[in-house]
Amino acid sequence: MFGRTLALAAVFATTVLSAAASLEECPGYKVSNVRDNGHTLKADLRLAGKACNVYGEDIRQLKLRVEYQTHERLHVIIEDSKEDVYQVPESVFPRPESEENDSASTKSALKFSMTQKPFSFKVTRRATDEVIFDTSNSPLIFESQYLRLRTSLPDEPNLYGLGEHSDPLRLQTEDLVTTLWNRDAFGIPPGTNLYGSHPVYYDHRGRSGTHGVFLLNSNGMDVKVGSEDGDNGKKYLEYNILGGVLDFYFMAGPTPKEVASQYAEVVGLPAMMPYWGFGLHQCRYGYRDAFNVAEVVYNYSQAGIPLETMWTDIDYMDGRKVFTLDSKRFPIDEMRALVEYLHDRNQHYIVMVDPAVSYGDNDAFERGKTQDVFMKSKDGAIYKGAVWPGVTAFPDWFHPGTQDYWNNEFKLFFDPEKGIDIDALWIDMNEASNFCDWPCSDPEGWERDHDLPPAPPPVRPIPRPLPGFPDKLQPGSVRLVKRDGTRLRSKAGLPGRDLIDPPYRIQNEAGSISNKTLNTDLVHANGLVEYDTHNLYGTMLTKYRLGDNLSEWSQYRFSISQILQFAAIYQVPMVGADVCGFGGNVTEELCARWAMLGAFYPFYRNHNDIAGRDQEFYRWESVTEAARTAIGIRYKLLDYIYTAFHRQTQSGDPVLNPLFYIYPEDEDTFAIDLQFFYGDALLVSPVTEEGATSVEIYLPDDIFYDYYTGEPIEGKGDLITMENVPITHIPLHFRGGQIVPMRADSANTTTELRKQPFELVICLDREGNAEGSLYLDDGDSLEQPHTSEINFEYHNGVLKVSGKFDFQNEEALEIKNIFVLGYKQDMNVQDKGNMNKDSQYDARLKKLAIKAKILLTGPSEMTLH
């Protein structure tokens, strides 16, 4: 057996080397029939020699279209001439609009040029002639099941993106293979493909600028970064794709933040979140009954830790079946009493729903079967997998009736009058995840052999009273045709492909591309196949949990890189890791540190697995203290956070920023992924090593202020050591030049928090100036009837408040304290000419504190002199 394995390995290695050699011998394409109207260039591409057919059949005739869509965005698409090859549907990904301008090609920030035989192209910056994309060193390969395109890179590139992954923020650039194929990935291991796919990278070149490259393609792919063979050894980035077309969007930047905004113009802006969504969330897989959930809520209250939203995992379901309730452990009367209790106290409730529907005797399945909305096998029968409830069916999201079916199930089960009156929903397992190994020919056997669904815990009487809770919670009381037989439209995929075992094998950690997911030869209701659309299943949302992480220091650390990837690169800003870790048993020290760090994720939730120890923050005294401290800081900053998040929903300007986004010319920031900016003002620098009570942090050449004291610190572009950092503390610094609006105090819920007046922290830059903003709305409505967008400017001793003041509230719309950090002398204060001596100055800290009354209902001005 061992000898046979070695023989197979040798054959495989020889095959790979042979394939690689054959790829370099492919003829590429030659150009003809070029048409250029100044805005759009079109050309025909024809195979330039004998087909190489390495991983499929070469497509002999292609076409090229180049559009100068905006001043900063260039669109380049290479597709088959007949448009039979699959392309991402417009219904899933609406294409960005193009600005019509006949002279765009001569004025755009980016310039396209090409060589006609063999075809290659370059994209350069018009202002500097710097080449940012160059395919001339390797032939274009466009086959039925394989596409390859290689571009040159600088010698020491700074690349970011190409996720989802748990690797460093700045990608390694030697022998890197990043695979894009959505996978349910317990433990989120580094170096593997994870839950989502984002085929975009940012190339940051310091003073030369930053550009972005987005490939609109949902097929599985390997993106390789390395050095060419030989003495030259030039760096390259290479796409190896299982199908689709080459549909590129180039974004000129030139700053990292501008690239982020330009990318948002292509993929769409994220949705705004409710104000309460930024509070603390608590969940666990393994709450045994409704009383257990209620007791957690009670314990948080008793510990004095503000809990905004309670969650329940799949435990509430009857046999893990979606849209059902375990009537013995989570009876409807107890669930409704729990939700009513939370709502009466301005708290919220969320449950999980998986996309897979239990196959068999349940109403949700029967309705879906009647409406014909489930994925089908080749024989027309409902495709079966195995997930938590056992044998399952999967909604076909391309079926025209699926959305109505799904909406109706929600309407029935979450009926506010009769069902569970939830405030939001958690969708999980939507990679799509399937426990059953490929080929999953006997899902019923898998269910039986793996004891699905898991046995629920024994039913128990309510064990003890919970003071203040309702009586209910107290003791004692594959053919490429549509299903209708019509022919497929164009751009739906070529016939004759091997949809299960393609000739080119991407480095999917799960092995076969059909393993642990839906079979890739399944045909959707609109005729598209799962092979092409797998990476689209369940990806049209903009709120993201980073998956089943582990309670380990390494995962605590790389969660920072992950949140930065999603918020700053992929335009998915409502993101967070499971605080204290999902899998394994967290230590007290790690949980305390994570409670502090998690307060600076946009999405802040403690969640863990049924097999791990309970890890609610109140389980340890030190973690309780850390959580209280962290939430107190977060809540005082919540309007600053809310404003930064709103800004990203309007412009794409990230709510979280790597240091190089703020200091793009400082080379020492390019690789930093253990510090980050929340918004533009707040530098977060957590302790990241076990047992450490100090942390070495980098401060760029700028003025900073200690968050806790206001003490100025001159950054010199060097590392400094923060000493005596206990597990209940996290180093925070304001950046000079920023004005930060804060609530005067924290609160137990975000509803109460909104009743607090404001304070302004004016952090002077080296010239004595600062600016900031504040966004206000009602915090909940999908369509906001009245909003305020307020600008603060401090210049030459004058604070100006201007902007739009449409949001009106009976209370809390005033600034009662102003703190000026970096002020160098005592002063008097004039407010519209009236002297106000109610101020204090700390000469050592250079901190001025002023009591004020500035209404946020209209413009105002205050002079400090």
From Swiss-Prot:
Reactions catalysed, semicolon-separated, are:
Hydrolysis of terminal, non-reducing (1->4)-linked alpha-D-glucose residues with release of alpha-D-glucose; Hydrolysis of terminal, non-reducing beta-D-glucosyl residues with release of beta-D-glucose
GO cellular component entries:
extracellular region
Localization, UniProt: Secreted
Can you tell me which family this protein belongs to? Answer: Belongs to the glycosyl hydrolase 31 family.
Q: Which GO terms describe its molecular function?
A: alpha-1,4-glucosidase activity; beta-glucosidase activity; carbohydrate binding
| Segment forming the signal sequence | 1-21
Matching InterPro entries: Gal_mutarotase_sf_dom, Glyco_hydro_31_C, Glyco_hydro_31_N_dom, Glyco_hydro_31_TIM, Glyco_hydro_b, Glycoside_hydrolase_SF
Q: What is annotated as the active site?
A: D428 (nucleophile), E431, D548 (proton donor)
Q: What highest taxon heads this organism's lineage?
A: Eukaryota
Residues annotated as glycosylated are N101, N299, N515, N549, N585, N748
Instruction: Set out the biological process GO terms recorded for this chain's protein.
Output: cell wall organization; polysaccharide catabolic process
What's the protein here called?
Probable alpha/beta-glucosidase ARB_02101
Tell me which UniProt keywords the record has, alphabetically. Answer: Carbohydrate metabolism, Cell wall biogenesis/degradation, Glycoprotein, Glycosidase, Hydrolase, Polysaccharide degradation, Secreted, Signal
